[in-house]
Regions:
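A short helix-to-beta-strand connector/capping loop
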Residues: 56-58, 118-120, 197-203, 258
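N-terminal Rossmann-like NAD(P) cofactor-binding subdomain of oxidoreductases
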Residues: 101-110, 118-120, 126, 131-132, ...
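Adenosine-phosphate binding glycine-rich loop
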Residues: 2, 6-7, 20-28, 32-35, ...
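Glycine/serine-rich phosphate-binding loop and adjoining beta1-alpha1 elements at the start
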Residues: 49-146, 277-283, 289, 301
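Rossmann-like adenosine-cofactor binding region
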Residues: 199-275
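Conserved acidic residues
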Residues: 3-5, 96, 175, 216, ...
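Glycine-rich phosphate/diphosphate-binding loop of Rossmann-like nucleotide-binding domains
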Residues: 142-217
């Protein structure tokens, strides 16, 4: 049995109150302050994971009890020792690979310092985050009746780690793609590269709102801390995959637009009859986030290496982890928004509201 660990942290108040209901009565700022002095702890033992190849894995969730606000506001050199301490706990439990969740892989140098301080390989899971965002977007577009080969796509944050690799791959599937970022020079370099290697018409823009208005599908991965997409920016029937943390899409889109589908990227179904994460993190049973799935896939494959670290992700990495996911029986299983699954009936309703009569067949991400 292969062993892995995944280090995570609370995203919002209910992540604390789920474990300690008494905290519902306490102001959230107080809870944040108290818990930032609490050392990392093992949350649960993960069992029952079995690949379709017969390989098995077990693992542990280890929590660093800091919220996104604290992680972003605390100096990086003070955050790293907290994550490293959690990593040492993982090593003591026998983990052969360690994954980093949510903001733990965003702060500072995206896992590089943490990996350097540990003896066990570390991955951010961003390769499969990109792969599943692409799969999720193409699947959602098909469910909304959008034919990818005729579609206009926009990638916001196109020059970042996940954004540039998403843009390179998405351009192979669509008619037209608009790359959005703040740095025009880097945008034009990426535009040139994509135009050379695909048949898509490639545009660049530094204005996300105008670029979004003409798009059938949008992948948002900007590191901007403010909201970039408002309800009035989207055309009816559009699909938006918001991979960014903090989010790029305003919560008002969900409240005011019943004719657009906003997803957080794919929910991944993890293989095994009796998969038990031993902890409720807001997903249906046997389902997990892509960065958790990447860590498990690497364990099952016995690829004990720093598969995804830092800010450079190659197309080959995304394609490889997507193939390995398929090999071991992991699949994108529906969609989620604000960490909650979106039921099929809701997707149907949104499609009808957009005036699209039926869904179409999704393209294959990896040929």
């Amino acid at each position: 049995v292969e062993r892995f660990a995944f280090i995570l942290h609370p995203l919002r108040q209910e992540d604390f109150t789920r474990k300690y209901p008494i905290l519902k009565a306490v102001p959230f700022r107080w809870v944040e302050e108290i818990f930032q002095h609490v050392p990392p702890r093992v949350l649960s033992h993960i069992t029952g994971i079995e690949s379709r190849t017969g390989a098995q894995a077990e693992g542990w969730f280890i929590a660093v009890p800091m919220t996104p606000r604290l992680l972003l506001e605390t100096p990086f050199e003070k955050v790293v020792p907290r994550i490293v301490r959690a990593g040492r706990m993982a090593e003591e439990l026998g983990a052969q690979i360690i994954g980093l969740g949510a903001f733990l892989k965003v702060v500072g140098d995206r896992g590089v310092s943490v990996a350097r301080a540990l003896n066990t390989p570390v991955t951010t899971g961003n390769s499969y985050t990109a792969g599943s965002a692409l799969q999720g977007t193409l699947l959602a577009a098909a469910r909304m009746g959008i034919r990818a080969e005729e579609a206009k796509a926009t990638v916001i944050g196109a020059t970042g780690a996940i954004g540039s690799v998403c843009a390179r791959i998405l351009a192979k599937h669509v008619a037209e793609i608009t790359l959005v970022a703040r740095n025009r020079e880097r945008l034009e370099a990426l535009q040139e590269e994509i135009a050379r290697s695909t048949h898509a018409e490639v545009h660049v823009s530094t204005d996300s709102r105008s670029a979004v208005r003409r798009a059938d599908m949008v992948i948002a991965v900007s590191s901007a801390t403010d909201v970039l997409i408002e309800p009035e920016d989207l055309r009816p029937g559009a699909v938006v995959c918001d991979v960014a943390r903090p989010r790029n899409v305003s919560a008002a889109v969900y409240e005011k637009r019943n004719d657009v589908l906003v997803i957080d990227g794919g929910v991944i179904r993890v293989p095994g009859e009796n998969v038990d994460f031993g902890f409720n993190f807001g997903f249906p049973p046997k389902h997990a986030e892509a960065c958790i799935a990447e860590t498990i896939i690497l364990a099952l494959e016995r690829r004990f290496e720093c598969f995804t670290l830092g800010s450079d992700i190659r197309v080959e990495q995304v394609e490889e982890i997507t193939r390995l996911a398929h090999k071991h029986g992991f699949e994108v299983a529906g969609f989620r928004r604000f960490e909650r699954a979106i039921p099929d009936e809701e997707v149907e309703r949104i499609r009808r509201n957009a005036g699209r009569p039926h869904e179409v067949e999704p393209p294959m991400l990896i040929k």
